[in-house]
Amino acid sequence: MAASNALLLISGALLISLAVLCQGDPVVDSDGDAVQLNLGGRYPLYTIESAAIGFHGGLSTLHKDVCKSYVYEAPETDRGLPVSFSASATSEPVMQLGSRYKFSFLMPVPRICDTAWSVGKSTEETGVYKLAACSCEFCKIACPEVGSFNVNGKTLLGIGGEHFTVRFHKSDALAMKTAPQ
């Protein structure tokens, strides 16, 4: 499949899932703490960064229009956009492996569209996760693995591509209002 056909266009309806090894265990951030969900009120923000060895930036978006953007790996000096997480099917306060969540990239300008993702474990290394794309929130079919593609000097995420794993890092701020549900 050509890289241009495999690029992952992120929209409000796209779900991302992480390959599941230990379904139900909590997802942990780079400090070893469980990743907290937005259940309303104040909630923590995170950045998502490549787990590869070397210098890498965090995940961010390249805007195509109001509700469509490509997810890419920002330059190494950029930790990426802050992200909040919410779940439609659970009231658990922490993210669990194998469950699906909305990941809301916090943009410098208001957006009315969210990106929904899901979580699972990549390796036995604590806090390292692999992404896979799902077409709907409650589908029972397997989700294809997400990898990286180098396009015009930028590392974009897409279906297939090079192996790509991530870590969650706490952001320096707490969100003060509820993210879009």
Curated annotation (Swiss-Prot):
Q: Which residues cross the membrane?
A: none
Matching entries from Gene3D superfamilies are given as: 2.80.10.50
Q: Which UniProt keywords apply?
A: Disulfide bond, Protease inhibitor, Secreted, Serine protease inhibitor, Signal
Compartments it resides in: Secreted
Q: What is one Pfam family matched by this protein? A: Kunitz_legume
Q: Which GO terms describe its molecular function?
A: serine-type endopeptidase inhibitor activity
Q: Which purpose does this protein serve, as stated in its record?
A: Possesses two reactive sites. Inhibits two molecules of trypsin simultaneously. Inhibits efficiently kallikrein, but chymotrypsin weakly.
Name the chain's protein.
Proteinase inhibitor B
What does the organism's lineage look like at the top? Eukaryota, Viridiplantae, Streptophyta, Embryophyta, Tracheophyta
